[in-house]
């Protein structure tokens, strides 16, 4: 099956799995998804990520995180820049999510990073997603 927006597919899988209280979710691997997963682990939204081979394809196994084993830590994920409508932000225009309670994932010339890291490095780029 051909997926037109693999990043949106990954975010939707994580959102659906966390709402269904699953302990882990499997997504097809790519370099971009690996970087997004790394950011989610670093920022404390998911517990861990492992890369595995499943037949001929690489997969990422994301271990989800819950508050007191009940409420998911990830309360929301939103894809911003889409294949049909790309959204870019200058270094001064990178948005803040929920007044700083969430994160922005930005694709810059130096790689994929959070909005705070992009502001600190004075880099703009494509706004991939909001996570809160």
Regions from the PLM with identified roles:
Residues 1-132:
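Core subunits and conserved enzymes of cellular information-processing
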